[in-house]
C-alpha cells in the first residue's frame, strides 16, 4: 500500500485532492494510506515524529510560513524521503522554480481527475 501525503493550507483543496484519489481507488481497485497536512511545518514535524515514508506528496506552494518549495527542499535532504515523488499543486505561473527539487509534476490548481489519475498510474508503475 502506498503512502500519500497532501499538504495545503486550504482544507477545501486537500479534500478535493483526496476525493480524486478515492475515486481512483474505486476505479482501479487499489488502496492508499492518505495523510493530510495544513502546513509544511506540520508535515515535517510528522515526518520527524513518526516512521512514515511517503511514496507521493502533493504540495501546495503558497502556504503561510514554509512554502511548498521550502518544504520539498527539506524533504529531499532526508535519506528516507529522497525517492519520494513530489507533485506541486499550485496557482503559480512560473513552474521553473520547482525544478530544483525534481518534482514528478507541477499541476495547476485545482487539478483534474484525469491529471491525478495519470500521476497515480505513474507512481504505481514506478513502485511495481
Q: How should these model regions be labeled?
A:
Residues 2-21:
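Conserved acidic segment of CheY-like receiver
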Residues 70, 83, 91-108, 113-118:
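Alpha4 helix (beta4-alpha4-beta5 surface) of REC/receiver domains from two-component response regulators
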Amino acid at each position: 500500500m502506498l503512502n500519500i501525503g497532501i499538504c495545503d493550507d486550504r482544507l477545501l483543496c486537500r479534500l478535493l485532492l483526496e476525493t480524486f484519489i478515492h475515486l481512483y481507488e474505486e476505479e482501479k481497485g487499489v488502496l492508499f494510506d492518505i495523510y493530510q497536512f495544513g502546513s509544511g511545518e506540520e508535515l515535517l514535524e510528522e515526518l520527524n515524529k513518526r516512521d512514515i515514508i511517503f511514496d507521493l506528496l502533493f504540495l501546495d506552494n503558497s502556504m503561510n510560513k514554509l512554502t511548498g518549495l521550502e518544504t520539498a527542499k527539506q524533504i529531499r535532504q532526508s535519506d528516507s524521503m529522497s525517492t519520494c515523488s513530489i507533485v506541486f499543486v499550485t496557482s503559480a505561473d512560473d513552474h521553473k522554480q520547482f525544478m530544483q527539487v525534481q518534482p514528478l509534476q507541477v499541476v495547476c490548481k485545482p487539478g483534474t481527475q484525469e491529471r491525478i489519475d495519470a500521476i497515480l498510474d505513474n507512481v504505481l508503475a514506478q513502485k511495481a
